[in-house]
């Protein structure tokens, strides 16, 4: 069968369905003219980045200044693999500032490294942080630490004037994880139990006294008698000056993503939480309500911004699996509710965690990290010489977010520097292509074992496979061919024909002989012959064909 015949099949209705769903993408140089035509079939010119936005191994881009905070254990190992395999081949990372926040290094420097990292973050404004360990008493002994180390997060939130911790669901086209559409969450970054002072006390009287800074007379906020022999007293407060910027960030993000916003408190019991809701509602009514109405985004919630009691929010998170909503809450409620979102959406590995603060000049400071920990169990397996299979998706989303924010800040600070503007465009093209390469690897059944089962790739093999696919996609951009855009069978097709996607995936694996996630011309031909779908030559065409 000729290359031209293949093109005719691809442009038929059935052919388009096969090509789109399976991502058939020619890889043989033997049919180069057809390869270009088939590649163009998958996208319009608008899908292809401009030439100046492309980069390659031979044309490294100087990455903009960024703070890179190293952590511990398996996630540190995985991030090292990712940076070496996916970033260093394409970027000069010499402008990044590195800080090692491992327990041992924090202990050796008496936590000066943490203070230095916070200072650098204030200055640069774009930070990536690997998961770190806040050592328990047992870990302190195991690591041989001199000092008791607290969580670095409090110092970071204070030093970067933290406003909110944005936690959003991560989605892979074609793979249903939990929520079908995005779910956004804004967690107030300061206040509450996380900054509390406390002490163990016995019987007595506890006074909480407020001393105004303007010289007014102090007064007692709370007085209580402690009659138990053993008590723990806790004091904390909730700063509300930054709730207004939190509201603007939240509502604008929901508006941009076309999702419906909700505000969560327990103000019916905790009367002091009324102020949070009041500020959010005022900002919404004055600046955003009409814009949400224009988009029809309030129809699902009675035509206005809705308040949810935190107890009710826990139930709705389980029920609203179609997604398409956002929530904003206090620090502690936000922590608990986003853990629940992670469970509905498969795992914390599919949730982002971005701290947003504000620099003195008004620009946003953004710190990006995965919402999971250091994955100690896999680290212990790795140290024991066992195979591991860590899904780095959350880590990579954080690196991508930090890299993009760094590029935006650098271009904004240097608007007349064409090299900075060009680098920003190149970085956004690269990160988009990286996401496509990583997501397609999962979709081809070549993911880690949490996604692909026992036959899934190891940590190292997955990184290598994505690196191979990333280079392939970037190289293809120079040839005017974009990364393949995998399409889903239409919902109408699924409904009418009861599509068995597992069986289809098995069929794809059967004909993808070399397991690279592509069906080339030869494999495609073999598949059509086996299925009795190959177009046959007419008698007239057969007579003309030479017998060789």
From Swiss-Prot:
- Cellular component GO terms held in the UniProt record: mitochondrion
Activity control, as annotated, is: The homodimer exhibits allosteric regulation by isocitrate. Activated by Mn(2+) and Mg(2+). No activation by Na(+), K(+) or Li(+). Inhibited by Co(2+), Cu(2+) and Ni(2+), but not with Ca(2+) in the presence of Mn(2+) or Mg(2+). Competitively inhibited by NADH, but no effect on activity by 1.0 mM citrate. Strongly inhibited by excess ATP, ADP, AMP and alpha-ketoglutarate.
Q: Mark out the transit peptide.
A: 1-53
Keyword Calcium belongs to the record: yes
Q: Which Pfam family would be a valid example here?
A: EF-hand_1
pH-dependence note: it reads: Optimum pH is 8.0 with Mn(2+) as cofactor and 8.8 with Mg(2+) as cofactor.
EF-hand domain span: 499-534
Record bears the keyword Chloroplast: no
Q: Where does Ca(2+) bind?
A: 512, 514, 516, 518, 523
Task: Tell me which cofactor or cofactors this protein depends on.
Answer: Mg(2+); Mn(2+)
Binding, Mg(2+): 311, 335, 339
EC number assigned by the record: 1.1.1.41
Self-association state and partner proteins as the record states: Homodimer.
Q: State the similarity comment.
A: Belongs to the isocitrate and isopropylmalate dehydrogenases family.
What note about domains is in the entry? The C-terminal EF-hand domain is required for homodimerization.
Q: What does this protein do?
A: Performs an essential role in the oxidative function of the tricarboxylic acid cycle and respiration. Catalyzes the decarboxylation of isocitrate to produce 2-oxoglutarate and generate NADH to provide electrons for energy production. No activity with NADP(+).
**Designated name of the protein:** Isocitrate dehydrogenase [NAD(+)] 1, mitochondrial
């Amino acid at each position: 069968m000729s290359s031209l015949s293949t093109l005719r099949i691809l442009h038929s209705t059935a052919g388009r369905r096969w090509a789109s769903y399976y991502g058939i993408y020619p890889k043989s140089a033997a049919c180069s003219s057809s390869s270009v035509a088939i590649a163009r079939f998958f996208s319009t010119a608008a899908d292809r980045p401009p030439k100046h936005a492309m980069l390659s191994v031979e044309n490294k881009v100087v990455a903009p200044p960024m703070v890179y905070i190293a952590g511990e254990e398996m996630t540190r190992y995985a991030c090292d693999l990712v940076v070496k395999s996916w970033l260093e081949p394409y970027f000069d990372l010499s402008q990044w500032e590195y800080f090692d926040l491992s327990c041992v290094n924090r202990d050796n420097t008496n936590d000066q490294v943490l203070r230095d990292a916070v200072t650098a973050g204030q200055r640069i404004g774009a930070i990536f942080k690997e998961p770190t360990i806040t050592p328990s008493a047992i870990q302190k002994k195991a690591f041989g630490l001199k000092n008791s180390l607290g969580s670095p997060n409090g110092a970071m939130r204070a030093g970067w004037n933290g406003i909110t911790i944005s936690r959003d669901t991560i989605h892979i086209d074609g793979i249903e994880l939990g929520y079908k559409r995005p779910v956004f969450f804004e967690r107030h970054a300061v206040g509450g139990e996380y900054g509390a002072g406390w002490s163990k006390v016995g019987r007595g009287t506890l006074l909480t006294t407020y001393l105004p800074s303007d010289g007014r007379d102090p007064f007692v906020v709370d007085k209580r008698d402690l009659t138990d022999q053993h008590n723990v007293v806790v004091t904390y407060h909730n700063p509300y000056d930054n709730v207004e910027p939190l509201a603007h960030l939240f509502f604008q993000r929901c508006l941009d993503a076309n999702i419906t916003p909700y505000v969560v408190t327990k103000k019916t019991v905790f009367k002091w939480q009324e102020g949070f809701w009041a500020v959010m509602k005022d900002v919404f009514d004055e600046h955003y309500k009409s814009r949400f109405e224009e988009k029809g985004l309030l129809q699902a919630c009675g035509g206005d911004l809705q308040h949810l009691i935190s107890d009710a929010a826990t139930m709705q998170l389980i029920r609203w699996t179609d997604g398409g909503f956002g929530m904003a809450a206090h620090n502690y409620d936000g922590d608990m509710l986003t853990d629940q979102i992670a469970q509905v959406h498969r795992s914390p590995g599919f949730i982002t965690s971005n701290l947003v603060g504000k620099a003195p000049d008004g620009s946003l400071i953004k710190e990006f990290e995965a919402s999971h920990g250091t994955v100690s169990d896999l680290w212990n397996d790795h140290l024991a010489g066992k195979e591991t299979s860590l899904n780095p998706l959350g880590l990579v989303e954080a690196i991508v977010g930090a890299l993009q924010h760094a590029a935006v800040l650098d271009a904004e600070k240097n608007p007349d520097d064409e090299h900075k503007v060009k680098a920003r465009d190149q970085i956004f093209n690269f990160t988009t292509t990286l996401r496509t390469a990583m997501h397609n690897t999962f979709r081809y059944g070549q993911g880690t074992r949490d996604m692909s089962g026992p036959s899934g790739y190891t940590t190292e093999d997955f990184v290598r496979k994505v690196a191979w696919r990333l280079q392939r996609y970037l190289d293809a951009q120079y040839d005017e061919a974009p990364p393949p855009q995998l399409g889903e069978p239409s919902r109408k097709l699924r409904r009418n024909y009861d599509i068995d996607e597992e069986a289809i995936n098995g069929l794809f694996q059967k004909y993808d002989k070399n397991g690279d996630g592509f069906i080339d011309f030869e494999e495609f031909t073999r598949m059509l012959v086996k299925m009795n779908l190959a177009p046959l030559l007419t008698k007239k065409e057969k007579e003309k064909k030479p017998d060789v």
